[in-house]
């Protein structure tokens, strides 16, 4: 099957890279990414639409006055391979911080709100409470919670509307190094944009 071929290509790439045969290493890396690109069916226009939807959502949301929350939340956003795991590890080394990892809740909530016809403060409050209930299932004892879903950068307006006191850490890295690191590592289908060099 295609995924076996993809993993084989990435493995052969790594073997060639280890013996410094970079020409053959890149050949297999490129093939693995091409096969993965077929599986992801990634279309840039779909991301453009999601980003525009989130911009429109924020324009709607910022007009609505809502209550805040007392839960301390830290959202770690950015590109994959930008140092976000290290940032979260450093934060959770503190006894009052719980690392939630990569949680898809915010993007799911954004999509739900985008699909809502009626929009008011109670709706925002409901979704805020839904998110807090979901993370409470993961950990309710730590006073600070981190959410490291990197692609939440698309939803920063929503995050700050739901949680005005939230902290956002945007992880960045030198762009060429970041893109190369992304390209040469296998990523799940949800990050389909990573397979085009």
Model-predicted segments: where are they?
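Alpha-helical solenoid repeat scaffolds of the TPR/TPR-like class and their adjacent stem/linker regions
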Residues: 1-138
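PAPS-dependent sulfotransferase catalytic domain
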Residues: 97-100, 105-118, 141-197
